[in-house]
């Protein structure tokens, strides 16, 4: 005697239930989306480093959340077409996440900075100030970089890095580290306003996978590999 298995019931979300869900969660969803929008809109290193870090965390969480949702769609696909598309989207999301980690690890090996795992950019601006290596992300591949010192406060492209510097502390070179190569910027113009104020313009001079000599005599530190960074 053969027993027939009862098929599992298929739950269909009706329009009325969708409207009810939106009515119940509309306020919370609106607050969450407003928060994310504000963070993405105003999260810049030149404005607030704290807000920028929150923005990076949100962007970083997008990949695992996307992978989870695409896998969920594969498990609960409505039909074969949705299943096929969900599988494709899952594979693409996983591949892109793996590529992100590979590039981030390569950049971390090059720089030694955890800014290498920034999901927004693979360009890390690096400058050696009296033996302290500052590393910060920049969005674009600039042809020139502006370094400003205002009453001892160090700024690069509007990003505050540190204090206690004079215009004489500005190095002759700085770099922008990327996954596959380094961009060297040479100081092309220097204007002294006072002992603790001035600015310099650095112009891109070389691009390649090479090392720069350390500014510290006898330290053995490689400027391009950027250890002891902040």
From Swiss-Prot:
Glycans are attached at residues 2-3, 5-6, 14, 28. O-linked glycans consist of Gal-GalNAc disaccharides which are modified with up to 2 sialic acid residues. The keyword Protein biosynthesis does not apply. The keyword tRNA processing does not apply. One of its GO terms (cellular component) is viral envelope. Changing residue 167 to L: In strain: Isolate ATCC VR-759 and Isolate clinical OC43-Paris. Its main location: virion. One of its GO terms (molecular function) is structural constituent of virion. Residues 1-24, 77-84 are virion surface. Keywords: Glycoprotein, Host Golgi apparatus, Host membrane, Host-virus interaction, Membrane, Transmembrane, Transmembrane helix, Viral envelope protein, Viral immunoevasion, Viral matrix protein, Virion. Residues 46-55, 106-228 are intravirion. It comes from the Viruses. It is found in: Virion membrane; Host Golgi apparatus membrane. It is a multi-pass membrane protein. Pfam families: CoV_M (PF01635). The chain crosses the membrane at residues 25-45, 56-76, 85-105. InterPro entries: M_CoV (IPR002574), M_HCoV-like (IPR044362). Belongs to the betacoronaviruses M protein family. Component of the viral envelope that plays a central role in virus morphogenesis and assembly via its interactions with other viral proteins. Homomultimer. Interacts with envelope E protein in the budding compartment of the host cell, which is located between endoplasmic reticulum and the Golgi complex. Forms a complex with HE and S proteins. Interacts with nucleocapsid N protein. This interaction probably participates in RNA packaging into the virus. This is Membrane protein. It comes from Human coronavirus OC43 (HCoV-OC43).
């Amino acid at each position: 005697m053969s027993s027939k298995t009862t098929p599992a019931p298929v739950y269909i979300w009706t329009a009325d239930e969708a409207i009810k869900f939106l009515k119940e969660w509309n306020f919370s969803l609106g607050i969450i989306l407003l928060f994310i929008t504000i963070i993405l809109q105003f999260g810049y290193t030149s404005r607030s480093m704290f807000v920028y870090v929150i923005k990076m965390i949100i962007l970083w969480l997008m990949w695992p959340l996307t992978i989870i949702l695409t896998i969920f769609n594969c498990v609960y696909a409505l039909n074969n077409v949705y299943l096929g598309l969900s599988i494709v989207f899952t594979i693409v999301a996983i591949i892109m996440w793996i590529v992100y980690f590979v590039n981030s690890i390569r950049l971390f090996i090059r720089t030694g900075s955890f800014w290498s795992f920034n999901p927004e950019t693979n360009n890390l601006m690096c400058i050696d100030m009296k033996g302290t290596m500052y590393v910060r992300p920049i969005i674009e591949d600039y042809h020139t970089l502006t370094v400003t010192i205002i009453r001892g406060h160090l700024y690069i492209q509007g990003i505050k890095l540190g204090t206690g510097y004079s215009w004489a502390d500005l190095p002759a070179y700085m770099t922008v580290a990327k996954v596959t190569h380094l961009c060297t910027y040479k100081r092309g113009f220097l204007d002294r306003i006072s002992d603790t104020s001035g600015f310099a313009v650095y112009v891109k001079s070389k691009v390649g996978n090479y090392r720069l000599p350390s500014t510290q005599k006898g330290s053995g530190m490689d400027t391009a590999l950027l250890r002891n960074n902040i």
